[in-house]
């Protein structure tokens, strides 16, 4: 059984592509037809490729993978933050800062600055500083929070990046490609799918479509992490049983 039904995809408007004059010919294999000068995405292919994406993400999650959800367009911002957080993962939903991945060391120094400012705000340091200085520091903290808050606790560069609209997020995709980080993405009919490792043919403009696909990816992460946790528990139980059995043998001797 598929992770998402045809009915869910239709209700979310996943099948609506862009106008026929705004298309990328490389998306032709994923187009079913055109209606009123709008391309209609082949949802049979979307279902299959979404299942593939789900299984891939779940497998990486089982191996303790780190995931970065990226979607900075207005329609994606809320869903990206909520679904990444629900899965215990990380996100960029405002402007992508060039070098977020390829210049990770510098980004880490900015993240450290954000953490330091938060600590100053919490431990009372701001209370003893001049108001003007506090105002400047607060503005700096808010700006850093806006752009880096979603990756503040990311332990390392991600193992997989999930992207809404790789055409808009081309800098992020390019950085991931450069570092060999696999990209899973919602790819609309106006986008070149070539740089994407795991393609999900989909409307990438409708809020409901974005939430459905991003939510499905978050579910895959959660299921994978739970599977890993269960495997760890089973391993511990197995080792405990083996130890007890060995002790019983020793006692018998």
From Swiss-Prot:
Keyword NADP: no
Biased composition (Acidic residues): 239-253
Single GO cellular component term: cytosolic small ribosomal subunit
PROSITE patterns: RIBOSOMAL_S2_1, RIBOSOMAL_S2_2
Region (Disordered): 226-253
Record bears the keyword Ribosomal protein: yes
InterPro entries in alphabetical order: Ribosomal_uS2, Ribosomal_uS2_bac/mit/plastid, Ribosomal_uS2_CS, Ribosomal_uS2_flav_dom_sf
Listed GO biological process terms: translation
Keywords, sorted A to Z: Ribonucleoprotein, Ribosomal protein
Coiled coil: none
Pfam family, one: Ribosomal_S2
GO molecular function (one): structural constituent of ribosome
Family statement: Belongs to the universal ribosomal protein uS2 family.
Protein name: Small ribosomal subunit protein uS2
């Amino acid at each position: 059984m598929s992770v998402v039904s045809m009915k869910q995809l239709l209700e979310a408007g996943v099948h609506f592509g862009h106008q026929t004059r705004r298309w990328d010919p490389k998306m032709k294999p994923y187009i079913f037809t055109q209606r009123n000068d709008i391309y209609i995405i082949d949802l049979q292919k979307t279902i299959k490729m979404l299942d593939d994406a789900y299984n891939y993400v779940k497998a990486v999650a089982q191996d303790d993978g780190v995931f970065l959800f990226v979607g900075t367009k207005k329609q994606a911002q809320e869903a990206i933050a909520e679904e990444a957080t629900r899965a215990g993962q990380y996100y960029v939903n405002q402007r992508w800062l060039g070098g977020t991945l390829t210049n990770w060391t510098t980004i880490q120094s900015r993240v450290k600055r954000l953490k330091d400012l938060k600590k100053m705000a919490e431990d009372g340091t701001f209370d003893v500083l001049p108001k003007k200085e506090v105002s400047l520091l607060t503005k700096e903290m808010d700006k850093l929070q806006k752009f880096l808050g979603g990756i503040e606790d990311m332990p390392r560069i991600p193992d997989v990046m999930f992207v809404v609209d790789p055409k808009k997020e081309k800098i992020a995709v390019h950085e991931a490609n450069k570092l060999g980080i696999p990209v899973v993405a919602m790819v609309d009919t106006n986008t070149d799918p070539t740089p994407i490792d795991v393609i999900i043919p989909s409307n990438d403009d409708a809020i409901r479509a974005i939430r459905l696909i991003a939510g499905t990816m978050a579910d895959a992460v959660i299921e994978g992490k739970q599977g890993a946790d269960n495997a760890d528990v089973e391993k511990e139980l197995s080792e405990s049983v083996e130890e007890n059995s060995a002790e019983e043998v020793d006692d018998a001797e």
